[in-house]
Curated annotation (Swiss-Prot):
Residues 1-242 form a coiled coil. This is Tropomyosin-1. The molecule is in a coiled coil structure that is formed by 2 polypeptide chains. The sequence exhibits a prominent seven-residues periodicity. The keyword Transmembrane does not apply. It comes from Podocoryna carnea. Homodimer.
Amino acid sequence: MDAIKKKMSAMKTKLEEADKQAQDAEDELTATLEKAAETEQTADELQKTLADLEDELDAAESRLTSLTEKYNEEEKKAEEGRRAHKELENRGQTDYSRLNRLETELAEITEQNEVVVEKLSELSSQLEENERILDEEEERCATADAQVKELEVDVVQVGNQLRSMEINEEKASKSNDQSANKLEDTIEKYNTIKDRADDAEARSRDLEAELNECDDELAAAKEAYGQSKADMDELLLELASM
């Protein structure tokens, strides 16, 4: 009987130990399940965090791409700005060189214009002088021509008087009633008129020579006037084409 009690007691003890082990195992399983649940929750949270990080990474990559594109655009604009600045510098240098060239050309044109104006003034004075000489020569030729015409009339009159005196002298020499004094007086008048006629002829020749000289001088004055006018027209044409 005691053996049975001992055996039952041993079995009870084993049963209690088994129950305890089962309880411990259950507790451990519960703890493990709780830990697994916590781990799963943590995994979910980590998964969510990872997804958020991936979204943030995508957003960051998108922003980086946008910033890269913007940087490239800004760099392109900066390069264009540097190129434009360089072109402006080159253009500025070109414009400066062109300005210097234009200033030099302007100075040359101004100097040429001053020379032309001075030459124009000289030609104008020369033209006025030639006009004055031409007027004087024309007046002189007109006066000489009038004197020649007057002498021609005078020569004709003296010739007529000489012929009349010769006729009277012939009549006087044929008339027996003419006195010697009247003959001498007639001869003296004849000589006076003849001298006057000779003088008129000499003066006529001188005036004709002077008239010829005057014509030559008038032609020379007209030629000089024409040349001065041609020079003036040519200079004005050059001045207009500048």
